[in-house]
């Protein structure tokens, strides 16, 4: 059974995550240990996304900026790429550092990405029949991970900065 805040669903019993291994935009290892000791907002997207991904990352960045005086510790904002063929760490670094605040990017093999997406109910599929400028269909949910690296809550789309500002202080 889970309880629902105004714009997110909080799990009564957070679900521990299993191991996965990705590479962060700065070249360091990004794994389950990277999610411990600090709350994290995970979003799965890709750098060539024309709309949902940049908008969601902007909304998360703006929410964190607004929450600076309202919460003791701001959550990390992490974009996991669902397009590892094009999203190298260098490209991902340029992309995530263009947003306000400390946005982290991570990428890896499809198998490792699926280890994480499978645990969180995130779907993604590349439309590679479109040529080199293909799109990637993906879930737009934002997942809140607690300090124990457990799936704690989900923000379902559509998102707005205000939704994150209203619900995050109630949860963190």
Where are these regions (language model features)?
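Short, acidic, Ser/Thr-enriched surface-loop or helix-capping motifs
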Residues: 24-25, 146
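Short, internal strand/loop/helix patches
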Residues: 93-139
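N-terminal targeting signals for export/organelle localization
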Residues: 1-19, 23, 171
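Thiol-based oxidoreductase modules, predominantly thioredoxin-like and allied folds used
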Residues: 74-87, 102-111
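Thiol-/selenol-based redox modules, centered on thioredoxin-like
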Residues: 130-172
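Conserved helix-turn-beta segment immediately C-terminal to the redox Cys motif
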Residues: 38-39, 55-80
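Short active-site neighborhood of thiol/selenol oxidoreductases, capturing the structured segment around
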Residues: 32-56, 60
